Amino acid sequence: MKSTRPFHPTPVITIDGPTASGKGTVAALVAAHLGFHLLDSGALYRLAALASVRYGIAAEDIDALVKLIDDLHITFREGCAQLDGVDVSNDIRAEAVGNRASAIAVHGPVRAALVARQRAFRKTPGLVADGRDMGTVIFPDAVLKVFLTASAEARATRRHKQLMQKGFSANIDDLLRDLRERDARDSNRAAAPLKPAADAKLLDTSALSVDEAVDQVLQWYRALGQPA
């Protein structure tokens, strides 16, 4: 049965899920297929953190951080995060950048500025946004909300493969333990806990290929009467 969700002139598809569920890859491929803009919300926080370090802005200088976030020139493409036109995908994964991201995100005005930047990615012809609270907090009016799930074992295997391909060593048992601990933290946190929106489509990717997951998202989008 076709959905009665109203058409939005600038449609948004949200793809949320836990770490290593495949949401980033699926989101990028769906966006590429539709010719939509792409938002990697997790990378956005790290990009802001990296920029604050490069421009010498202290983690406690709230006003300067807010202005920096407002002025950032950021672009996302499949597997690539660009800051001021330069690919910094590897730079933002550094532990120091992650620590800085956590340090600046404790400030309410900084979080508000980051939320505003995320919503500003909504531009014609449309947006695919991936993260943890895209469908519940950032884009509650999205035309399609997808929540990807996968077993912890499947996600640990994927993450291990990703790290090995990038030349990093990793112990799969340690990765599995870390994923389970992070799942517990994300699901139980007070602010924007990791959970599907009430109207989200659930997609278990444990036994699906990337192409199969992308095809399912596109099928759901077409079923809404949207061109795909």
UniProtKB/Swiss-Prot annotation:
Protein family (similarity comment): Belongs to the cytidylate kinase family. Type 1 subfamily.
MF terms (GO), sorted A to Z: ATP binding; CMP kinase activity; dCMP kinase activity
Protein source organism: Burkholderia cenocepacia (strain ATCC BAA-245 / DSM 16553 / LMG 16656 / NCTC 13227 / J2315 / CF5610)
Localization (cell): Cytoplasm
EC number: 2.7.4.25
Keywords: ATP-binding, Cytoplasm, Kinase, Nucleotide-binding, Transferase
Residues that bind ATP: 17-25
Catalytic activity, as annotated: CMP + ATP = CDP + ADP; dCMP + ATP = dCDP + ADP
Higher taxonomy: Bacteria, Pseudomonadati, Pseudomonadota, Betaproteobacteria, Burkholderiales
GO BP term, pick one: nucleobase-containing small molecule interconversion
NCBIfam families, A to Z: cmk
Name recorded for this polypeptide: Cytidylate kinase
Gene Ontology cellular-component terms listed: cytosol
Name of the top EC class for this enzyme: transferase
Record has Nucleotide-binding as a keyword: yes
CDD domains reported for this sequence: CMPK (cd02020)
Organism superkingdom: Bacteria
